């Protein structure tokens, strides 16, 4: 801490101002405000962070001493003002709590009551954010014995005013001789750390991390120092190095990492104007700029800053894990030496942990840096790596160079890991944590800590990749096989499961580089296969999977799967059933590893449908595609059989069907056609809109809720329908619009509730939906089609130009309208209003919400059911859509394309 800093606080000048004022409050406030401005100015100018937070603590020391001296304490031998917690360490950020202990020597302290109350009132009046307690020495001992937080705070203390002897008495009665011996304290702090990490999903890679509490945050460093203080009486990183728990290089890395997080936290407090430790989207751009990250693309600057953040917290996690494991080995060690068991000449087990047999193992036999992970996969009883061996790995990873990467012993060991029955994910994660994976695969090193500034990808690229491999492993286990039955079954019969793990490892490895990441990744995967001398068939499959890992999800979500041509084109692209099996499993794992909320029952159904129909096409032979007319005949024949069995007159059926057109029978199954037909024929002529609701499938974890509407066609039908569904809190995922020759509309919507599930067996909810839609369609003129809702906080920070593409389908008489835009409440209803204004008919729609953006595809025609052919009409349509999508946003540009 500075001994004196007149620019920050001049004692003489301050006391002179106090003497001139009737009330001290204004002088204190002015001093605090001016000092804060000085510190913020120094921060913006790039001053070192440590002197800044120490200077703020020094400032508060002076303010508190001056405030303390405003009151008559009489005999001061029995009272002291003590700083505890972070302030006790001499560290204060702009809005950190100032934790104070008013320490009393005896239980009888009535003489101080009035002065204490007036002192605390003054602190609040002058704007200090104070957390205070008033305790005697004995009360400190009593509460510290019962509360881990109290003993932790008291360990970090400084006397601000009053006799130091009181604090020394307090430290004596709360020492390890009286309570919380180091072993008990360590176990409690370790449990506290694990619980805190679990609160933040046990990952350093949250989209909006907490710089203090998240794994790898400042609290992890403090936990290590608290344990060290309890065990050794030391409370700084340099002293830890002196005790042998840290190398000097590790001490420097941990200190620089702490400084980086201090800068981020200081900036957060300064920008938020309050104690804010969450690195929210609201602040990420401003902090990136403040800390000097720049790019022509502001989004890229944020990603650069966050990648640095994630790499820093990963380093902190690694080093804190190492120190805590050292503590375990020292503090929890039994009296007698632990048992050892040899594994081979290079490694042995020590109390269940693997360790090197001598310090030069990795220097003499570098291949052991990969062998250790294979051994742990082959021996799942191994609990982990001994701390000294982790340090040896870190010290020798520089030996992993191009020669190492092409050594057949090393390439063979790496492939061997992927053939192990268990432990693949666990040991790849260890390799990444210890910095081995990124050294062995430099292309993987590029994606470590790399984030994408959106709500779709909730993990960094490396974390997502390892999550994907973890999900592939889970597909073999019963709990998830119930949720993913087809993927689990296929995973169990893949001829070479190691190939899907390798494809998963490389599927996103091209991200962050200029160009298509699938193509870049395929090139890297090809080089990997050649370096590891994989057979030609294996190499071709891995490269193909990397290159095409997005094709299946894109087809399922954006194409009309009822169109035989779509299925045939996809089957031609895939080529054979083996590739189809691998691609389906990889796609399921990829979606779930990207963001668990993306996986819903309807997406599961779409992928199953695409898989099943493609498999049929492949077995039928690609030279024998299913004919549209043949599919229509099959659907009608099967539906008629169902209806006749139920007693329906075939003539009535044929009369109705003659009005519906071919597309209706292509877009619906025979069971649905029979269900619709029976209900329509029983509907009274003046019965109003017919609204039917049922589940699309009885399979658990699949399907959605199908809403079928039959009513006289009207101009604003779609706009009113989607607005009503929005008000009913339904998310539309698919829409099929048919208009009969008798001018009735037959619309089918696939919807999910806000939680991503179908409506299910809920009669009250079904009635609410049916009544709400019926009322809206009976009185469309009274129904608002523009829904006003509050935009969620996170969505506000992802404002990008909408992309609108209009093109005519070469195979069908429709125009395809593709829209990518920020997700906003009521978006579909707004588009429905535009379709109404332009006299357009919607034939089909595929709706996908991916994090903060929507990717919607609409199949539209003009009023005569023809594709749009007027370029000026298309331009006006595009302009209207962009204006509507940009309403209330900051975007002023868009990307558009019109093709005929």
UniProtKB/Swiss-Prot annotation:
Organism superkingdom: Bacteria
Region ranges (Uridylyltransferase): 1-342
Pfam families in alphabetical order: ACT (PF01842), GlnD_UR_UTase (PF08335), HD (PF01966), NTP_transf_2 (PF01909)
Domain HD: 461-583
A molecular function (GO) term: phosphoric diester hydrolase activity
GO biological process, one term: regulation of nitrogen utilization
Reaction(s) catalysed (UniProt annotation): [protein-PII]-L-tyrosine + UTP = [protein-PII]-uridylyl-L-tyrosine + diphosphate; [protein-PII]-uridylyl-L-tyrosine + H2O = [protein-PII]-L-tyrosine + UMP + H(+)
Role: Modifies, by uridylylation and deuridylylation, the PII regulatory proteins (GlnB and homologs), in response to the nitrogen status of the cell that GlnD senses through the glutamine level. Under low glutamine levels, catalyzes the conversion of the PII proteins and UTP to PII-UMP and PPi, while under higher glutamine levels, GlnD hydrolyzes PII-UMP to PII and UMP (deuridylylation). Thus, controls uridylylation state and activity of the PII proteins, and plays an important role in the regulation of nitrogen assimilation and metabolism.
NCBIfam families in alphabetical order: PRK00275.1 (NF001366), UTase_glnD (TIGR01693)
Protein's name according to its UniProt entry: Bifunctional uridylyltransferase/uridylyl-removing enzyme
Gene designation: glnD
